[in-house]
From Swiss-Prot:
HAMAP family, alphabetized: GrcA
Keyword list, A-Z: Acetylation, Organic radical, Stress response
Full protein name: Autonomous glycyl radical cofactor
Gene symbol of the encoding locus: grcA
Residue ranges of every copy of the Glycine radical domain listed in the record: 5-127
Organism: Escherichia coli (strain K12)
C-alpha cells in the first residue's frame, strides 16, 4: 500500500518538511520533494530515513493506462447540414477545413467518396 507523508521531525535536517511516498509492501520510500540531500524520485529503503515523525497526506493514485496500438480522436465542430451543403455547393465553402487522420484538410479537396465517408463517420446516432 502507498502512503503519502510529510516528515515533521527527523535527526537529519535534509528530511525536515520533505514529502515522500511510502511503499509498505516493498519497504521503500520515494522522495517527492526535499530541501536538500535527496533528489526528486529518489528511492531509498524506509530504514534509511532513520527515526522520523510524520503526518500522512492524501494521495490520489490514478490507474496507469497502457494501450497497445494507440488511439486517435479527431474533433470537428460542425453540423451535418453544413458538410452536406458543402458537398452540394462547394463554392460557398472554399475555406472549410476539417481534421482527417491527424491533419487538417480542406473539405472541398476531398473526393466525393471521402466526403461521404467523413460525414458518415463524424455524425453517428450512438457509440
Amino acid at each position: 500500500m502507498i502512503t503519502g507523508i510529510q516528515i515533521t521531525k527527523a535527526a537529519n535536517d535534509d528530511l525536515l518538511n520533505s514529502f515522500w511516498l511510502l511503499d509498505s509492501e516493498k519497504g521503500e520510500a520515494r522522495c517527492i520533494v526535499a530541501k536538500a540531500g535527496y533528489a526528486e524520485d529518489e528511492v531509498v529503503a524506509v530504514s534509511k530515513l532513520g527515526d522520523i515523525e510524520y503526518r500522512e497526506v492524501p494521495v490520489e493514485v490514478k490507474p496507469e493506462v497502457r494501450v497497445e496500438g494507440g488511439q486517435h480522436l479527431n474533433v470537428n465542430v460542425l453540423r451535418r447540414e453544413t458538410l452536406e451543403d458543402a458537398v452540394k455547393h462547394p463554392e460557398k465553402y472554399p475555406q472549410l477545413t476539417i481534421r482527417v487522420s491527424g491533419y487538417a484538410v480542406r473539405f472541398n479537396s476531398l473526393t466525393p467518396e471521402q466526403q461521404r465517408d467523413v460525414i458518415a463517420r463524424t455524425f453517428t446516432e450512438s457509440l
